[in-house]
Amino acid sequence: MQKNSDASLKKLIEEHELNCFTKSKKFILDNPLALSIDDLSRLAEMANGLQESTAAYYTDPKTVQTLCQQLPKIHKRTLRILEPSVGVGNILRQVIHYYKGLFDSIECDVFDINQHSLEICEIFIQKEFSDFNNLKINYIYDDFLTHQLEKKYDLVVGNPPFMKIKGVYRENLRQEFKNPIADNISAFFLDKSIGLSNYVVLIMPKYFLHNSDFSMSREKIKNTNIQCITDFGETLFKGVLIETICLFLDTKSENISGTKVISVPKKIELIQDQSEITQSFFPNWLIYINESFKKLASEMNFGIFNVFRDRQITSKILEPTGDIWVIKSKNIPRSGDKIIHIEDDVFIEKSALSKLGVNKYLKRDDVFLSPNMTYYPRVVVKPKNCVVNGSVAIFELKPDISITETDLLFFASPEFEAFYRIARNHSTRSLNIDNIAIFYFGKRNHCVQ
């Protein structure tokens, strides 16, 4: 385990000029302060100058142990592992430890586009497994997604980057993996991995469960055996506020015993029906779906609103006084029955507003407002002669649908709040009300006008 704080390691990096790779590599090789492997690994990640551009972040060893507890049981004499984005090997080393005594030999192909990371990974492997003669690792300095692979593996395991990509590179990958809507590079890592191995264990952004650009990747794996989904929440990466999950897939067999769902933040473990998680009625996967959710869903009419959100209104163009009131999420109390003025109300001049998309709603009072980033949903009628900033979404009823005050108050009820948390998979970060989330703001069938 890591024994030194990040602050202490940062001080070491500065004192020993470890942002220089040559010095960093020598420091790790010599280990003059007798640091633990985990400390050295964290230090190497912190000193990685390419971390942001390659979306490579430190995977906490404690979290990797949680991952390893769900690794598949594989019955062979030689285990063949592929790590598509190995970094300095934090996951790889613990996976090898897990399987070390269970096979005659272990063979690994490991990829990374950062040659320095591969060199450090090799040092750590040599330090930690010097007594393991039947371990063979092939270090490949190349892009896993474009590298031609002929062989098959028993296990693909890793933590791919999560960044969005564009341009020719993205279009080539979309064509190669028959996924014309994917924007996030992790989708292509998953698409390629499931064609290479019996078992796939990949860490993914939690918004994989929700976002529309992952919908084709979700479709590709919904009929594999999803043995387990571990929800790490925000615990996986130190210093990076992103929620993650880990998918454990058996690509060759059917799921007959259910999908294990583990929530690290909530400390719960469930066995869910895979077909209910991956159902097609709702626009996203639902890993925490339960009887209460299904009961309320059976009473509701969904997809009644379209949503609009404008992020063009920034603090630069707002004033403490002015022509037009700009409603923020703070102006909509938890009670969900009114809009209130607050001490730090803000306003915008007509001339500035006229250039923005939200201006079209200025005179309207037939649309509705909802705070955007919250677990406490509420929906209120928009007054005339005001607009909203990006913290508030505007709901517009679809044609031939009406709504009552009782329907609106339902959105602020504890019953709908619990329902909505499950709809959002208990996320804490990805809570924007987008074209997926708006689906769940429905109303009970007996209230439909």
PLM feature spans:
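C-terminal substrate-recognition regions of SAM-dependent nucleic acid methyltransferases
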Residues: G233-S370, Y375-Y376, P383-K384, L397-Q449
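Short amphipathic alpha-helical segments
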Residues: I106, S391-A393, A437
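Signature of N6-adenine DNA methyltransferases within the class I
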Residues: E52-S53, Y57-T66, S85-V95, S105, ...
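Flexible, charged surface loops at secondary-structure boundaries
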Residues: I74-K76, L149-K152, I194-G195, L318-T321, ...
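Short, compositionally biased
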Residues: V381-V392
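Short strand-loop junctions, especially beta-strand C-caps/beta-turns
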Residues: S24, I203-Y207, G233, S391, ...
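Class I S-adenosyl-L-methionine
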Residues: M1-L102, D109-E128, H210, F214-S217, ...
